């Protein structure tokens, strides 16, 4: 009989990088999150969907979100709960500020040891960095097997998974033992919509910091009455870490500048479609090394 699984989805609240302005970076080389609207990282939504599908295959399984960020990152935990997740953990502390992928993966791996897991699922990469490093780094730090570029979990039997992954020129089906880390592509199934009943049920979910800010609110009273509305908040004090590996101190990478690049044509040439025009275009493209 297949046992129930504790599935942890690594997710990130990211700035919407589709409209990056001059205020996108701080002088210290970190993202100015206050200057950009925040969204659920797209491929992490694909990861959430695969986790929820696996939960449905294994009765009794749970899906929890683990995200590292400021207090407002609790929003994506609530969003995940609206879609089917059971709860979440917000890893938040000023000591995490300035973390690159190395420091982030270290903090996440320490938190994962604290909360426990049978399977860790993450999006391939975050749109505010495009490194695709955090998932593999977490696997390395935890000593777990990793499967990247995943687009489907075909079977989950016993303590192993059969996974289809997307490669450059096709797909590959592999078997992997659990516990493991898998990172999920955008080619995986799109996340399911929010469920209206779950929205009504979990809209009151809060972290302790939010409760402390409004202790007499209706939301705070609802959380006090229902444990399932309590989102766990973890700080450096709650996990076993070497603080020299956190935040700025643990981050060898610094971003100097981010620009929104828009390519504009300086001139345009209209072609009639005649053979002579096409031949002339081919000569120009070859001469400019665009072709050939």
Residue ranges and their predicted role:
Residues 1-292:
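N-terminal glycine-rich FAD/FM-binding segment characteristic of electron-transfer flavoproteins
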């Amino acid at each position: 009989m297949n046992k129930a699984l504790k599935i942890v989805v690594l997710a990130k609240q990211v700035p919407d990088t589709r409209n990056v302005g001059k205020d996108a970076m701080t002088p210290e080389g970190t993202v100015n999150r206050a200057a950009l609207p925040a969204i659920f990282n797209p491929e992490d939504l694909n990861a959430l969907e695969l986790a929820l599908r696996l939960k449905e295959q294994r009765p009794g399984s749970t899906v929890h979100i683990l995200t590292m960020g400021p207090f407002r990152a609790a929003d994506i935990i609530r969003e995940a709960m609206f879609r089917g997740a059971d709860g979440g953990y917000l890893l938040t502390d000023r000591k995490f500020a300035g973390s690159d992928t190395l420091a982030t993966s270290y903090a996440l791996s320490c938190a994962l040891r604290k909360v426990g897991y049978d399977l860790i699922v993450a999006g391939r990469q975050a749109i505010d960095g495009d490194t695709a490093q955090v998932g593999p780094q977490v696997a390395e730090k935890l000593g777990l097997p990793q499967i990247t570029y995943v687009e489907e979990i075909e079977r989950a039997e016993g303590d192993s998974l059969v996974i289809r992954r997307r490669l450059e020129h096709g797909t590959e089906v592999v078997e992997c033992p659990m516990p493991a880390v898998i990172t999920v592509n955008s080619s995986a199934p799109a996340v399911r919509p929010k469920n209206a009943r779950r929205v009504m049920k979990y809209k009151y979910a809060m972290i302790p910091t939010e409760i402390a800010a409004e202790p007499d609110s209706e939301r705070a009273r609802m959380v006090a009455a229902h444990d399932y509305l309590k989102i766990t908040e973890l700080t450096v004090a709650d996990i076993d870490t070497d603080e020299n590996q956190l935040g700025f101190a643990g981050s060898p990478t610094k971003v100097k500048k981010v620009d929104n690049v828009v390519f504009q044509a300086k001139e345009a040439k209209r072609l009639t479609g005649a053979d002579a025009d096409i031949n002339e275009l081919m000569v120009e493209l070859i001469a400019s090394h665009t072709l050939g």
